[in-house]
């Protein structure tokens, strides 16, 4: 998803929900910290988000902008309405969210704001998900110098998951770091 597509889907979410502030927790949250991240980090066609002040209205995002919606069919990308529990990011992630104002669209009265996971929290939440593409994402952020290995490793103990999963995340990160 290109940065302009991210802005478009956020603006559309504002129109669909009547909300202006959204928390972005998926891979597109990288666009909160970096205007032009490496192309390899922008492969997803989905923006995972929920309205900050009314997370329950995330269903309206799925209905209007979700996978298979008219919006998706028209533009080739879509939004996935999620909830605050979706992000398995290190404790305190809510205090580290990165604010990105989205330009107002023509004929819109909404001024959307994306509150994006801070990049280290984003990478660690993807590591918890643990799919191959998530590990590739983590490796690419390290390779591109977008995250610090020391910060990632320091936040692993703060992940809200079982100890065995935290240990696995740390082992995998150390393996990736050693390979760079």
Residues covered by each model-derived region:
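Compositionally biased terminal segments of proteins
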Residues: 1-180
